[in-house]
Amino acid sequence: MFVGVARHSGSQDEVSRGVEPLEAARAQPAKDRRAKGTPKSSKPGKKHRYLRLLPEALIRFGGFRKRKKAKSSVSKKPGEVDDSLEQPCGLGCLVSTCCECCNNIRCFMIFYCILLICQGVVFGLIDVSIGDFQKEYQLKTIEKLALEKSYDISSGLVAIFIAFYGDRKKVIWFVASSFLIGLGSLLCAFPSINEENKQSKVGIEDICEEIKVVSGCQSSGISFQSKYLSFFILGQTVQGIAGMPLYILGITFIDENVATHSAGIYLGIAECTSMIGYALGYVLGAPLVKVPENTTSATNTTVNNGSPEWLWTWWINFLFAAVVAWCTLIPLSCFPNNMPGSTRIKARKRKQLHFFDSRLKDLKLGTNIKDLCAALWILMKNPVLICLALSKATEYLVIIGASEFLPIYLENQFILTPTVATTLAGLVLIPGGALGQLLGGVIVSTLEMSCKALMRFIMVTSVISLILLVFIIFVRCNPVQFAGINEDYDGTGKLGNLTAPCNEKCRCSSSIYSSICGRDDIEYFSPCFAGCTYSKAQNQKKMYYNCSCIKEGLITADAEGDFIDARPGKCDAKCYKLPLFIAFIFSTLIFSGFSGVPIVLAMTRVVPDKLRSLALGVSYVILRIFGTIPGPSIFKMSGETSCILRDVNKCGHTGRCWIYNKTKMAFLLVGICFLCKLCTIIFTTIAFFIYKRRLNENTDFPDVTVKNPKVKKKEETDL
C-alpha cells in the first residue's frame, strides 16, 4: 500500500482554514515592494553566515522543504493535485541540482534492469550446474529437494509481507535487494573458494580387460558436500528473499510513475532484461557442464580442492554478479519514493479504474496484522484476480518445462553433446521468451488496450502457441541402433541387457557412459561393452581396435595399417530436422511470452490501487504453489518414465538416465506443455467473462479510457 495524496472534500472548515494563508499571500507583494525601497543594512561584500557554516546542498534541501510546506499550507481547489509528497533525488539530506536530471523513471530503469540481469545470471548458473552437482556428490532425495526448492519456498514465504509492508518505502527495499543479491551470490561461491578437502574418485578402465582393480567407494566428499550444500541452500534462500522486492514492488513502482498505457513497455523491458540475465548465466555455465571422459588405465585418482575443476570457474561468475549488484546500491538509494509527476499520474489513474467495489476506492489500511488479513480477504474474494494468478502459474509451467527438459530432449533426440545441447537450449529458450515479453509489452502499450482487451490478447496468443506446440511432436528423429537397447548384438544378446557373450569376460561397468560408434553403424555404451581390447590416439582422438562385438561394416585402416573398429562419440542419426524444430520451438516461446506482461497489467487493473502490491504478492504465492515448486518435479518425473537405461555405479548410487525413449519423450514433453497452455486459456476465459459481467453490472464505472480514437470506438462497441 503506498501513501497516496490526501483527497480534499472542499468543506467549509477547510475553506475557512485556508482564508488566513490566502490573505497573507495577497499581502506579501506589498510588503516586498516596501522592502525594496529601504536601503540594505548589510555590507555588499559580506556573505550570509549560513553559507560559511553549512554545505550548499543542505541549504537547498532546507529551502526545498520550506517551499513545499508553504505550498501545502494553502488549501487546494477540488480539481487541483497536491504534489507536496514528491521528493528530490539525492542521498539522504545531500541534494544536488545535477542529480535532478536523473530523477525520472528512465534512469531508475537502468539500475533496476542491471539488478535484474545480475539475479538472472545467478539463476542461470545455478540451473545449468545443479544437475552435475547432484550427480557428482550423490545427493539424497531430501537434499535434492532442499537444493532445488529453497529459492521458491523462501520467496513464497516472504512475498505477502514484503508486498504489504514494503509498499510504503519501496526504494529502501530495492537497496536491500541489491545487497542481498550480492550476498547470496557470495554464499554460493564461498565454499568452492576455500575448500581444501580431497575427494577420491573411481578410475575405471574403458577397454576390455579380464583383470581390473577398481577402488574408491570407501572415500567420499562428505565434508565438502555438507559444507557446500549448506552454503548453497542459504544462498538460494537469500536470493529468494532478494527477488520479491524487485518483482513485486518494482512493478508497482514503475506502474505508479508512468502513464497507464506506457506501463506495458517498461514492464516488457524489465521482463526482457531478466531473461537476458538468465540466458547470460546459462551460456556462461554451459561450457562448464561436466562431460564423462574416457580413461586409459585403472587408477585411483584424487581431485584437489574437493570439487571438480569446473567449480573454480563457476565461483568467479558468482563473484562477478555480486560485484555488479553491489554497484547499484548507491544509485538506487538516491531515488525518491515519489518521483516528480507521480502524484498527477496516480490521481489520473484513480479516475480511470473502477471495476472493483466503489466502497474500496478510498480504502485506508493500517500496518498491523488485522489490516493485512482484511486486505488479503478482499483480494481472495476477487475471482478475476485469482483466475489471472492461476493463468500466470500455468503459463510459467511451460517455461519451466522447456528450461528443465529441452537440453535433455535436444541431446537425445538430435544426438548432441551435453555442452552443445545446453548452449543451444539457452540460445533458443531465453531469446524467444525475452523477445515475446518485450513485444507483448510494446503491443499492448501501442494499442492502448483496456483490461478486457488484455484478456482477449492473452487468449489469442495462447491459442496460437498451442497450435505451434502441436507441430513440434511431428519433428523428431528415428532412434539410432544401440547395442543392448534396441539391437541384440547381432542376435547373440538380449534387448535391455548391455552384457552379451562377446563382452561378458570384460567386467564392464555402466557407471561411466562413453559411447562409441562401431564400423557397423551401431552405437555401444562404452569401448568395454564393444569388446575393444586396444586403443591409441589418432589426430587427438582415441580410436579402438580388436573389438570382439563388432563383426560387420566397412574396414578402415589408420596411418600405421591397423584396422579401426570404432571411434568415440555417437553415431550419425542422419536426421536433419533440428533447424525445423528450433523454428517451431522459438515461435512457440515468442507467442507464449506475449501473455506475460498483459497478465500482470490485468491483475493491477482489477484491484484498488492501494492493494496492487499486495495483489502481486498473492499472485506470486499462487505462482510458487501451483507453478515453480511442483513444475520441475512434474517434468522430471515425466522424463524418468521415458528412461531406458540408468546409471547405477559400482558404489550402488543411482545416477542420471543415459538413454531415453525418444518417441515417448516427445509425446510427454508436448503433452504436458499442451495441458498447461490449455489451462491458461481456460482460466483467462473465466476471468474475462466474470470481468465482463461485473462491468455490465456496474455501468456507473466505465472501463479504462483510451486515447486512440479507433481503439476507443472498438471498445465502445464491445461493451
UniProtKB/Swiss-Prot annotation:
Pfam families named in the record: Kazal_2 (PF07648), OATP (PF03137)
GO cellular component: basolateral plasma membrane
Span of domain Kazal-like: 496-551
Sorted UniProt keywords: Cell membrane, Disulfide bond, Glycoprotein, Membrane, Transmembrane, Transmembrane helix, Transport
Compositional bias of kind Basic residues: 33-46
Membrane topology (Cytoplasmic): 1-106, 167-171, 255-274, 337-378, 445-448, 605-613, 692-719
Extracellular side: 127-145, 197-223, 296-311, 401-420, 473-581, 640-673
Tissue distribution: Strongly expressed in testis. Weakly expressed in spleen, brain, fetal brain and placenta. Detected in lung tumors.
Disulfide bonds: C502-C532, C508-C528, C517-C549
Membrane topology: Multi-pass membrane protein
Molecular function terms, GO-annotated: sodium-independent organic anion transmembrane transporter activity
Transmembrane segments: 107-126, 146-166, 172-196, 224-254, 275-295, 312-336, 379-400, 421-444, 449-472, 582-604, 614-639, 674-691
Residues with glycosylation annotation: N300, N497, N546, N661
Cellular compartment(s): Cell membrane
Domain of life: Eukaryota
One of the protein's GO biological processes: sodium-independent organic anion transport
Family to which the UniProt record says this protein belongs: Belongs to the organo anion transporter (TC 2.A.60) family.
Protein name in the entry: Solute carrier organic anion transporter family member 6A1
UniProt organism field: Homo sapiens (Human)
Gene name in the database record: SLCO6A1
